[in-house]
Amino acid sequence: MYQFNREEYNKRMEWYVDARFGMFIHWGLYSIPARGEWVRSVEEIPKEDYMKYFYEFDPKDYDPKKWARAAKEAGMKYVVLTAKHHDGFCLFDSKYTEFKSTNTKCGRDLVAEYVEAVRAEGLKVGLYFSLIDWYHDDFPHYGDRQHPMRNNPAYTNENRNWDNYVTFMHNQVREICTNYGQIDVLWFDFSYDDMMGEKWGATKLVNMVRAVSYTHLTLPTT
């Protein structure tokens, strides 16, 4: 089990404090409608309607080498990519969901390509991961403050299993921490209302990350 040590923490944080300047990339299915990563929530789009972007997704011009090169030329020291945002769409080849880039026309593990490109430029590699997943059936729908179906009583939470969801989420975090080599920044997003801390199994999650990966820095958002 991971035990917090201030001296070790400060040492791990040195590069991040010194870096000061990095690139944070929000990119995914929501880039198609181009109305922001929260578009499904803001416009209360049903899953069935949002799926049209999944079937359309085929980013032929995706070139993380250009992103990484631009970051380096600008003097940046690290890059963070949204491996999965709140819509639940994975840019990586997760075995726990069908809602992923490898199942689209594109058929590629986009996180793998990104990681390779960033490392090739000598930059630190970061991945953003959403604790929230609006695609997963066990995540709270009706009455949740953020879910696209929060105002639709047809999406009652009666048969949703929160423990199943937490297990699923932890398993996906394990994947991104073990399948892509050293991850220098792991950025979790986010907590609200009663969805805080141990609701997500936070202690178990952090201990797992420390145990299975070479992750240097774990950052929650508020």
Regions found by a protein language model. Name each.
Residues 1-217:
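Mature catalytic domains of secreted/periplasmic carbohydrate-active enzymes
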Residues 218-222:
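A short, hydrophobic C-terminal helix/tail in secreted or cell-surface proteins
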